[in-house]
Amino acid sequence: WNMYEHKVLSYVNGKHVPVPVNITTVNELFDLKISNTSEMQSWLKENQVKGEINNSKDSALAKVGQELYELMFENYTIKQWDLNPSELEPSVLERIPVRDTFNDRYFSDKYEGLPSNGYTEFVKNILDHKNITVELNTEYNNSIHKSNKLFFTGKIDSYFADKFGKLEYRSLNFNYKTYDIEDYQPAAVVNYPSLEYPYTRKIDYKKFYNTTSKYSIIAEEFSSSIGEEYYPVPTKKNRDIYSKYQAEAKKLESNNIYFVGRLAEYKYFNMDQAILSALELFDKIYKK
């Protein structure tokens, strides 16, 4: 592991400011001189919009107030989901923390990092085992009879032939550009919340591994409803449909069929959460 610490910036009004929101974010955007936690907490309290939390807009307003919501979250969310935050469940913006310190790390875990040779090699090493056979371009239902247990990681609605209706997913498109410059942007990931930019963020991959080059290969990331399914869309309608599939999936556990992962559990997972979910399922099955 390379012990990389993830830091994200957002390009707002010509300035790069930290995400999650922290003291520096507020000072830069509003020309303030907040210097400690107490002052930051006071600023947040003055700006937060209190009320019932029914959706992601309510969630963001309760955390950061109207101005920061409009500057950093509203249009970014619209670009990412093609929905207004008021149409999304609270969980979308609820999971983004707000800091009352100068801490600019995206995550707060004690240990953080990426596999030294990347996730492709990481997965290759996992699969390189005498008891594992990989079959590509093969329909899962052709292999069910070969297994004592089936762990399904595809779309749960597809498994059940969409009998309760199709679930919605979002995909991504990437536009890669090469620049004759060593340091194109100040962080590995820079968000672009303004509708002035069609992409949601730009990524400089070499910063994940602290490598150097006289060139910068930048990925512009675009959210899309077309393409490989990456993100479940967290609306009440989708949640209600998923609950029906979830009940059906639970019944199949007695037949040793299990649903795991983003698409099968219709849930947003970070990488560490996805791995933990798989390990917990293993313990549930084999440590009874």
Where are these regions (language model features)?
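A short alpha-helix-loop-beta-strand transition element characteristic
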Residues: W1-N13, L68-E70
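Mid-domain catalytic core of redox enzymes
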Residues: T138-E248, L252
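Hydrophobic residues at beta-strand termini and immediately following loops
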Residues: V19, E220, V260
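Active-site/ligand-binding neighborhood in enzyme catalytic cores
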Residues: K15, P20-K149, F160
